[in-house]
Amino acid sequence: MPKFKPKISMKITLNYSPNFDPFKRIKKQIKFIIFHYTGMKSEKKAIDKLLNQNSKVSCHYFIKNNADIIKMVPETYQSWHAGISKWKKFKFLNKNSIGIEIQNSGHDNKYENFSQKQISSTKNLLKYLMNEYRVK
């Protein structure tokens, strides 16, 4: 199967969070891609929280309102997005997943629809990650 090549329009910048486990994991450990929305009033506040060491929360990727993507934690490390979690036989999903936060004010803060640009950017990133890590 040929590898998916991200579209040129997929802009990824680096802004690393200090919040991750320093133990490297191998590609085959990654079984899931988990999506979240930020649930915060502003994009800046969401990014600041993900970069704040005291918040103890992070993600691998953050999708901005304008559809730009920020890589916050390399996939080879566990970000802190799933907390104490379980799904089927898997526990502590951070160790087996890639976490993607999509900027959205959420249901507590006047929920807004995701833009078509955000959806397109998310789909491109998802296709790339599914191929790269053989996630089904």
Predicted regions and their residues:
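Active-site-adjacent loop/helix surface patches within enzyme catalytic domains
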Residues: 2-134
